[in-house]
């Protein structure tokens, strides 16, 4: 693997997955395709999660209420990402919840208006993550608690790449189809990076059993969601890729909260 190319992929992934400004030099010769760039999603997720993690850790170190610290960290994370994945979760919930068949579900997902299912999904997403982070903040030292945020970001970004790889594009003219689909190589690199980075972040404070359980629950969540999307839509969309990230991040946080 060419390190220079991988560095460029990380920068492009950060630009795609967040609102963090990236120097234009990293986009020279860029064709806009994300198939190869997807291998850098886990590391990019770690970098994107740093502002939220620092916020969470500093607030806990100053004895802030863990729930308040968790909500502020999630607010920082949402601003950093531009609610990219939350938007995908909301649209996917509306489509799968309100669409009686595949075509109707895809049409609903394309509609920018939020429906009941989407609103409930967002409330549950923020509520579950905030509750889990608050529990983590009460059970771990500030630094160890803060490291769970990039760890969940890493695992969920790896899971979204696998979801993207495992399914064909549901719409040939959709955004996800135009961005390209990861090949086996980039997908494998993304999963290996997610495994190594999450182990480095979690193992020192939570030890092997908690890390393995978190990994297993995240894998199961990704598999079950991907299977459901395959049955309902016969393929992925940009929205389902974002929803996969959110679902797996929730799964990781909730599992870690039960292990502290």
From Swiss-Prot:
Keyword line: Cell inner membrane, Cell membrane, Cobalamin biosynthesis, Magnesium, Membrane, Transferase, Transmembrane, Transmembrane helix
Cited Pfam families: CobS
Main localization (coarse): membrane
Reported cofactor(s): Mg(2+)
GO-annotated molecular function: adenosylcobinamide-GDP ribazoletransferase activity; cobalamin 5'-phosphate synthase activity
EC number per UniProt: 2.7.8.26
Reactions listed under catalytic activity: alpha-ribazole + adenosylcob(III)inamide-GDP = adenosylcob(III)alamin + GMP + H(+); alpha-ribazole 5'-phosphate + adenosylcob(III)inamide-GDP = adenosylcob(III)alamin 5'-phosphate + GMP + H(+)
UniProt-listed GO biological process terms: cobalamin biosynthetic process
Transmembrane segments: 40-60, 117-137, 147-167, 186-206, 209-229
Membrane topology: Multi-pass membrane protein
HAMAP family per UniProt: CobS
Task performed by this protein: Joins adenosylcobinamide-GDP and alpha-ribazole to generate adenosylcobalamin (Ado-cobalamin). Also synthesizes adenosylcobalamin 5'-phosphate from adenosylcobinamide-GDP and alpha-ribazole 5'-phosphate.
Name listed for the protein in its UniProt record: Adenosylcobinamide-GDP ribazoletransferase
UniProt organism field: Rhizobium rhizogenes (strain K84 / ATCC BAA-868) (Agrobacterium radiobacter)
Gene encoding the protein: cobS
